[in-house]
Amino acid sequence: MAYEASLIEKKWQKIWDENEYFEPKDDLNLPKKYILSMFPYPSGRIHMGHVRNYTIGDALARYYRKIGFNVLHPIGFDSFGMPAENAAIKHKIHPKSWTYENIAYMKKELFSLGFSFSKKRMLATSDPLYTKFEQEFFIKMFEKGLIYTKEANVNWCEQDQTVLANEQVEDGKCWRCGHEVVQKKMPGYYVKITAYAEELLKDLEELKDKWPNQVLTMQENWIGKSEGLEFSLNLDEESKQKTKESSLEVFTTRADTIYGVSYIALAPEHKIVQNLLSQNLLNQDVLNKIKVIQNQSPRERQSSEKEGYFLGIYAIHPLSGEKIPLWVANFVLADYGSGAVMAVPAHDERDFEFATKYNLAIKQVIQTQENLPYMQKLGKLINSQEFDNLDCNEARLKIISQFEAKNIGKRVVNFKIRDWGVSRQRYWGAPIPMIKCQSCGIVPQKLENLPITLPEDVQITGEGNPLDKHPTWKNCICPKCGKEAQKESDTLDTFFESSWYFARFASDEKTWQEKALDEKSVKYWMSVDQYIGGIEHAILHLLYARFFQKALRDLGYLTQNEPFDRLLTQGMVLKDGAKMSKSKGNVVDPDEIIEKYGADTARLFILFAAPPAKELEWNDDAVEGAYRFICKLYDRAQNVKKGELVELKQENLNKEEKYARLKVYEALKKSFEVYHQSFAFNTLIAACMEALNALALCKNEALEQEAFYIILNILEPIIPHVCFELSEELFKCKNFKKLELKEEVFVKDTLNLAVSINGKKRAEFEISSSASKEEILAFAKENTAKWLEGKSIVKEIYVEGKLVNLVIK
């Protein structure tokens, strides 16, 4: 009977669905595994990146389910966001209709691949029920001071007409549409992620050896903790008159280089710069250039060529009394430290580049034979008055102490991470549950009024926020004073939704109507045991999710410190050496692969072609090869004895049979390591292929039966449909359980030993594994007799199971 993928796969998908085979059990005393792949945006079709992500997760979920764990393996859709609005403009379709039509199609595609997702816990973040509890979290955070409003410069995308978080600006462009981003002053809501900066940094230690080092490093750098000195510099008298300011604050991590300061660099937004601008004390050319800098995103400023302009004013060095020129510079950010940087060109590369460009003084204060700039924190101070000849660290501590003693500075800790702006001027998002009242100011909605849902009678034009233009939706009554008021028309950044969906999945779906998170079930299921997704989410999603976990813990919703215990970042799927994309014309449609070869072939290829963390190059020939392997497995199984296993006696097997059985059990042993630790599915599949090849040389019915019993067990998480089909036919699926190794299979009948004389290999021989040490040494001498002739043996060394070494003279 020929292998018919479509019939087999549809049959088993129906059986699994009807029997709710993949739903988590209610028994919370069972050992648990929560396996989660990052949920998709419902763009309309799944791509090979999705297939890879979900195949890895599904293999792990199926494995743990099979060996007796209570497994939660959910799926949902990150369904708010700009693409739905863009589609509404392009195709004249409502964002909601576009989104839910896509969800319906993608669900069909995902389940056609045999993924063992829980259907009962499926959700979309645009569902009103999800919005209700998200708005509840927002209000609770607002009441605790974790969300606040402020007017600030924001990253503004002219194309999408919305605000972007710093993390969403890539090389000065919108991460979503690629349009140039400008700086714009706007009011908005901010999440106080900085309140958790220290904990977010400290808890990265808990994730070492469980998360990729690259992700940990990226988060550590993004949080950007720095300890240093914050101090005041007085302005000279003329500068005080010009700026209407008497002093400015500066932060430095290198107090030891304080005597090397040759200029102070200010952010364009600094109060002193703004005062000069407001009094028209800067010429038009400088004014125009400052405006250009102000329109750059923080990342652009950091990466572009260093530029600056002398402001014509001076500060007084707090220790030496020297006059220091003040410059405005594009590399200084207003919200890091005080928006002012003390520049030490001799010992900082950026400062050196700037000073060289503008011919500013370069004062060396650390002794070195190396070329400047010398940036090491090693060496003795010079040109630093009473601190000369101190090493850098000692000098740093003493200088800080002197500033504190004089009450002109203090030790401080700064973080590079900024609070998260979550206001978005778009329609298709979760409405921010706040009210603007002329009498009361900003007031939260009452919890009983949630969810605040979107009106459906809107015109999506791409110009501004449709909620602002709606004739009635904004109108409401202030819950505090009872007067007429207006709803907030901004919606939430979609990363707000994806920052807690994993906890919602962990909550018993029977409680979803009543509460955001069910305490009992989230305590049992959280944290996620294995999280799978792309490295591109290292800073954005993963950092926000970690913050949310801690914030919800402190609000009493959760108990764990971290949301994801282990993280796997899978590599991209490439074709012709490039990421698959429509513009490159190198997209492979998963539907076509399933139709031609079946879902199991797609899954097998995906897991066999490369280790999960590495990039995967699409190869049509390798897909054909995967299909041929499944056909071969299916054909071979037709001749396997059905029913209960016939007991095998190891001592009754011949050499070839023992070797084949060893290969089968080696594959089983490897499966434990692969599923629990390395995820190197390619090596596991190769081990199964090797075992089947060895088995083909044997004619032992009982051995073949045992081998298929084990191999179908190993491969079921990878190619589930065909393994269920064959296992039901042969063993009534009794092989789908935790299998044990048989130690006697690994005991070798003979040993292959090498013989070395004075460390040089001279011979090899085979001997019974039951031979005594004396017998082995005697056999070794016999095999090396010609090298021993006329010599005396000084020492005999036997390294058990490996070699004999004879020392002669």
Curated annotation (Swiss-Prot):
The keyword Calcium does not apply. It is an enzyme of class 6 (ligase). It catalyses: tRNA(Leu) + L-leucine + ATP = L-leucyl-tRNA(Leu) + AMP + diphosphate. GO terms for molecular function: aminoacyl-tRNA deacylase activity; ATP binding; leucine-tRNA ligase activity. ATP binds at residue 582. Gene3D superfamilies: 3.10.20.590, HUPs (3.40.50.620), Isoleucyl-tRNA Synthetase, Domain 1 (1.10.730.10). Belongs to the class-I aminoacyl-tRNA synthetase family. This is Leucine--tRNA ligase. GO terms for biological process: leucyl-tRNA aminoacylation. Keywords: Aminoacyl-tRNA synthetase, ATP-binding, Cytoplasm, Ligase, Nucleotide-binding, Protein biosynthesis. NCBIfam families: leuS_bact (TIGR00396). GO terms for cellular component: cytosol. InterPro entries: aa-tRNA-synth_I_CS, Leu-tRNA-ligase, Leu_tRNA-synth_edit, M/V/L/I-tRNA-synth_anticd-bd, Methionyl/Leucyl_tRNA_Synth, Rossmann-like_a/b/a_fold, tRNAsynth_Ia_anticodon-bd, Val/Leu/Ile-tRNA-synth_edit. Its main location: cytoplasm. Its EC number is 6.1.1.4. The gene is leuS. A motif ('HIGH' region) lies at residues 40-50.
